[in-house]
From Swiss-Prot:
Protein name per UniProt: Small ribosomal subunit protein uS14
Obligatory cofactor(s): Zn(2+)
Oligomer status and interactors: Part of the 30S ribosomal subunit. Contacts proteins S3 and S10.
GO biological process: translation
HAMAP family listed in its UniProt record: Ribosomal_uS14_2_B
Family: Belongs to the universal ribosomal protein uS14 family. Zinc-binding uS14 subfamily.
UniProt keyword terms in alphabetical order: Metal-binding, Ribonucleoprotein, Ribosomal protein, RNA-binding, rRNA-binding, Zinc
Cited InterPro entries: Ribosomal_uS14, Ribosomal_uS14_bact, Ribosomal_uS14_CS, Ribosomal_uS14_sf
SUPFAM superfamilies: Glucocorticoid receptor-like (DNA-binding domain) (SSF57716)
Keyword rRNA-binding attributed: yes
Length: 61
């Protein structure tokens, strides 16, 4: 889980537009962010395995 201070800092408008970055809406993780879902890969995997993300299924071949 990300520090609350870092989550608050990320919500503020950056001084320059290129300094902005995405964070996971669920845990606040800044890395491995999946733009389509708005969450990080770890949260995505947890929610997908529980079946909470519509249209996402575990692949098997």
């Amino acid at each position: 889980m990300a520090k609350k201070s870092m989550i608050v800092k990320a919500n503020r408008a950056p001084k320059f537009s290129t300094q902005g970055y995405n964070r996971c809406k669920r845990c606040g993780r800044p890395r491995a962010y999946m733009r389509k879902f708005g969450i990080c890969r770890i949260c995505f995997r947890e929610l997908a395995s529980q079946g909470l993300i519509p249209g996402v299924t575990k692949s098997s071949w």
